[in-house]
């Protein structure tokens, strides 16, 4: 079988990457070792930047029609009782969006299947061979391979790529359960996470309503100790923790799905090994707190997709594909850093010093500037990396066709040159990869060039700088443009 891109892993990262590639008409095949999709809810909500990214492709609204019931409250840092306020970041989604990971995966896979993309399940990878011209995985030949196969990446192991970092010091469980009986302490609606996290009888735990009679239980021992990661999770283990935290009146009904997690923290030194690129948990792992793992993986895919497509479609500038690593590696490193800090602060039972540290952080988070700083990191709205421009705010526009907004103009996954000052600008040499729109807006800006991933590549009025930015990010023009800046 011949294709252009082989994606290994049908989680959110792999599915999002495949979607980006198919928008650019790049042949892609997705391989997944699990025969059926994992039904466990896992991450229970999407961070604001993930919501923005999905909105940039028109993928969010169908999910918003089926969100989980929750109060409109901000995110959290280490479970501290202060809401993270994302409104200063000018986002349409200032609160985490209640969409379980399983539902997101189902939605993305449905989109791929409707576009004719093969998602081949029950295909565990046992052989990866690459040469100067491409990659062979079993009987499939492609130009590149994207390893999106999780923290225990088979591709990474086969290639012998080191995964430096530290082992976990915490052993915890997340489970989708039903309740036979419930006490008054069991929540009926999602609130701020600080109101859900509880400690009792040597355990910490949180119980979040999903839908119907289904709940998401997370628990572990305050000591951090627990069974090995591969140890089976028994009903007795779940029942003991549930009763310890939520009282003897709360009876376990059924354990639907369950898995263990830890605070292990690792990151690849380089996200590329020849013609193999790593994304999502295959490139970095950390304590799964605040939905940052899904956030990172989706944005990895969003950054990589258009660059990989440009490369195989023949218009990528030199070293464009290498900017995937230089832009995404420092962002993930920052997440690993903040989750290590959270792993300490989230556990108040460790010692008095940690309690004092928690109190100090609570005071800091009540300061607007400190809250904005932390909320930008956790939400993914504040992204900083060498050469990476800021995200384009989803502003209201008026075009000749009527009112619209930036995100609605980017569903096709192409670049966008937006002229807001009434001047005519030309992208004729790049018209096969960049859309040109004239509009009016309340924004005080002449014009802006937006990359397919929603980051600003250029803004202002300087025509020569615009042409340089077009060449830098979108390659050489098919025809040399006339100077109509």
What are these regions (language model features)?
Residues 1-358, 362-369, 481-485:
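Core Rossmann-like FAD-binding/catalytic domain of the broad FAD-dependent monooxygenase superfamily
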Residues 433-440:
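Thiol-based oxidoreductase modules, predominantly thioredoxin-like and allied folds used
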Residues 204-208, 404-409, 446-447:
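Short, surface-exposed beta-strand/loop micro-motifs that present aromatic residues
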Residues 283, 447-457:
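Short, glycine-anchored, charge-dense loop/turn motifs used at functional sites
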Residues 151-153, 423, 455:
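Short glycine-rich anion-binding loops that position phosphate/pyrophosphate groups of nucleotides
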Residues 1, 270-271, 409-411, 441:
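Short, flexible hinge/linker loops that cap or flank conserved catalytic cores
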Residues 309-399, 406-415, 420-429, 444-445, ...:
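C-terminal helical "tail/cap" subdomain of flavin- and related membrane-associated enzymes
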């Amino acid at each position: 079988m011949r294709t252009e891109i082989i994606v290994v892993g049908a989680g959110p990262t792999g599915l999002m990457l495949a979607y980006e590639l198919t928008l650019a008409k790049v042949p892609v095949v997705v391989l997944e070792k699990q025969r059926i999709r994992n039904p466990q809810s896992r991450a229970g909500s999407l961070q604001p930047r993930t919501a923005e990214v999905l909105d940039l492709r028109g993928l969010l609204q169908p999910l918003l029609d089926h969100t989980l019931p929750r109060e409109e409250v901000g995110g959290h840092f280490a479970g501290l009782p202060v809401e993270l306020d994302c409104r200063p970041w000018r986002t349409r989604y200032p609160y985490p969006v209640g969409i379980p990971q399983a539902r997101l995966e189902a939605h993305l896979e449905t989109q791929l299947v409707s576009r004719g993309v093969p998602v081949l399940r029950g295909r565990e990878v046992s052989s990866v061979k690459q040469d100067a011209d491409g990659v062979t995985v079993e009987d499939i030949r492609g130009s590149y391979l994207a390893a999106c196969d999780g923290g225990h990446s088979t591709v990474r192991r086969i290639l012998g790529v080191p995964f430096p970092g530290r082992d976990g010091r915490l052993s915890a469980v997340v489970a989708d359960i039903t309740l036979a009986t419930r006490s008054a302490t069991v929540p009926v609606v999602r609130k701020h996470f600080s109101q859900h996290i509880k400690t009792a009888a040597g355990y910490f735990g949180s119980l979040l309503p999903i839908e119907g009679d289904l709940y998401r239980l997370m628990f572990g021992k305050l000591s951090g100790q627990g069974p090995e990661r591969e140890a089976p999770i028994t009903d007795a283990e779940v029942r003991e923790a549930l009763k310890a935290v939520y009282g003897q009146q709360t009876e376990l009904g059924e354990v639907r799905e369950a898995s263990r997690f830890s605070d292990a923290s690792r990151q690849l030194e380089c996200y590329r090994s020849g013609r193999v690129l790593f994304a999502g948990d295959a490139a970095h792992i950390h304590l799964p707190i605040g939905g940052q793992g899904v956030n990172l993986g989706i944005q990895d895919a969003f950054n990589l997709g258009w660059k990989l497509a440009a490369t195989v479609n023949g218009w990528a500038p030199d070293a464009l594909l290498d900017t995937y690593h230089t832009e995404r590696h420092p962002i993930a490193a920052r997440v690993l850093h903040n989750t290590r800090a959270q792993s300490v602060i989230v556990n108040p039972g460790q010692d008095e010093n940690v309690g004092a540290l928690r109190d100090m952080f609570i005071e800091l988070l009540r300061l607007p500037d400190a809250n904005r700083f932390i909320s930008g990191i956790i939400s993914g709205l504040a992204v900083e990396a060498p050469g990476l421009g800021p995200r384009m705010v989803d502003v209201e526009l008026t075009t000749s066709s009527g009112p619209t907004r930036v995100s609605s103009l980017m569903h096709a996954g192409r670049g966008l040159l937006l002229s807001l000052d009434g001047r005519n600008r030309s992208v004729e040499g790049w018209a096969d990869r960049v859309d040109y729109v004239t509009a009016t807006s309340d924004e005080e800006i002449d014009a802006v060039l937006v990359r397919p991933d929603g980051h600003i590549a250029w803004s202002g009025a300087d025509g020569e700088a615009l042409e340089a930015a077009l060449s830098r990010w979108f390659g050489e023009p098919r025809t040399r443009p006339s100077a109509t800046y």
